[in-house]
């Protein structure tokens, strides 16, 4: 009998729970469809949001703290193995062995104590703090279910209240029918029964509403008191937790520093006793690292190789005979650092010249370019005086001259280098720093470099019977004699002087060939790489574009490594210098004739 009773109770509870779930599901559907209103508490909803945020932060802190403790334990194991290795390599006869072993033991105990205190003062406190969240979370969920029950009971009671008149009409209608079928004495009892049944349903709905409201309000009041206090308690918990961790870590590092200092003292004593056996680590040069002196900048990929040049120190040298490491750069501009944009800067040789003279040697087949440089720019081997006039001859192949003026010397014959003979210069005609004729050098006398350059020569060179006409200034008697002596052994020399440019301004010369060029035109360059302009005053260049270089209006505005110019295509199309000109990096271009 007892078993039958327990089964009946269990079945009744199951049926009651199923009925509650169906009622709640029906109420939620009606609320979502908008056919039933929902009770809302914005203040409580804000407390629930804070609770969820606090739970998320606490869970993350607990996870990170466990990770920190795992790292401490791993560090403890690594330190323990390192100390064991030290004990193994420490010889028994070495001084301080006992102290080293004691330090290793204290180190191990210190790590264990640190880990245990972190667990007790941080991790366990964290677990206790988070232990209260599951219960509150379940109560919040239960409060939500009770709120649905309360809304359902309220809606049921309200529906009975609104349907009261309809029920009375339904009751009165059958009475009118019963009056015809039932006896007179039964009609009153039937009507009383229907009224009693309606009142019973209404009373039951009211009781359910009061009960649901009471349960909901009790849970709601408790949660509204606990949630704000729990939210405010997070500040004190965070402070205590991180203060404990910081204090434990500080004490740990203090004690660890003392142990490390003691170990260092033991090792210093060992080093003093065995000082003669000190092991010194020396840096070994890398086999792959090139020597600093042999490192030379290379042009960007795709740029043409540098043309072999002949360095002339009053003595002709073959193009392939240059010794490594002794190549003289044309100008210090090779060390110029280009704009910091890819491709890598191209070291374009440039030279600042006072005069340009082209000597047509070997009858228009090979024309050397003679440039006068200052002694500070020339680094020639051999003893030279600081006051001596030096020559830097760069022989670059140029197109043949159409109408050269030749001196009255044997013409039409090419004289090889091995047929040139040294010329003895008169005593005192050359400065003391220049090589003498006895050394087998090719002696040529030139005007002093300290003299100011004279006016530019006309385009047609004059013929001089004894040699070439000097570019500027007058020659001293000794220099004239040296020039005559040198010219007697020189082959046919063709002199053609081009107009000199001072700060980009052409002085002298015929301007018939430059009518279509912009004012102040200096020379042409061709872009070797694409360049994307980064400012409004810069030119946009593509590989192969030809740029006409012009001087800056204000020389002080010129930056190192930059030139002012206008693209040839833009100039030919618009002829407007102000709109078309701009600056561009010199190392992205190459000078063209």
From Swiss-Prot:
The modification Phosphothreonine is found at residues 307, 323. Residues 280-354, 400-488 are annotated as: Disordered. GO terms for biological process: cytoskeleton organization; endocytosis; endosome to lysosome transport; lipid tube assembly; negative regulation of amyloid-beta formation; negative regulation of calcium ion transmembrane transport via high voltage-gated calcium channel; negative regulation of potassium ion transmembrane transport; negative regulation of transcription by RNA polymerase II. One of its GO terms (cellular component) is plasma membrane. Pfam families: BAR (PF03114), SH3_9 (PF14604). The modification N-acetylalanine is found at residue 2. InterPro entries: AH/BAR_dom_sf, Amphiphysin, Amphiphysin-2_SH3, Amphiphysin_2, BAR_dom, SH3-like_dom_sf, SH3_domain. Residues 29-276 form the BAR domain. Phosphorylated by protein kinase C. Changing residue 151 to N: In CNM2; results in severely decreased membrane tubulation. It comes from the Eukaryota. Ubiquitous. Highest expression in the brain and muscle. Expressed in oligodendrocytes. Isoform IIA is expressed only in the brain, where it is detected in the gray matter, but not in the white matter. Isoform BIN1 is widely expressed with highest expression in skeletal muscle. The keyword Cell inner membrane does not apply. Residues 378-421 are annotated as: Clathrin-binding. The keyword Membrane applies. One of its GO terms (molecular function) is aspartic-type endopeptidase inhibitor activity. Residues 2-122 are annotated as: Interaction with BIN2. Residues 15-42, 193-267 form a coiled coil. It is linked to Myopathy, centronuclear, 2: A congenital muscle disorder characterized by progressive muscular weakness and wasting involving mainly limb girdle, trunk, and neck muscles. It may also affect distal muscles. Weakness may be present during childhood or adolescence or may not become evident until the third decade of life. Ptosis is a frequent clinical feature. BIN1 mutations have been found in families segregating autosomal dominant centronuclear myopathy. Patients show adult-onset, mildly progressive muscle weakness affecting selected proximal muscles and all distal muscles of the lower limbs. Is a key player in the control of plasma membrane curvature, membrane shaping and membrane remodeling. Required in muscle cells for the formation of T-tubules, tubular invaginations of the plasma membrane that function in depolarization-contraction coupling. Is a negative regulator of endocytosis. Is also involved in the regulation of intracellular vesicles sorting, modulation of BACE1 trafficking and the control of amyloid-beta production. In neuronal circuits, endocytosis regulation may influence the internalization of PHF-tau aggregates. This is Myc box-dependent-interacting protein 1. It comes from Homo sapiens (Human). The lineage of its organism: Eukaryota, Metazoa, Chordata, Craniata, Vertebrata. The gene is BIN1.
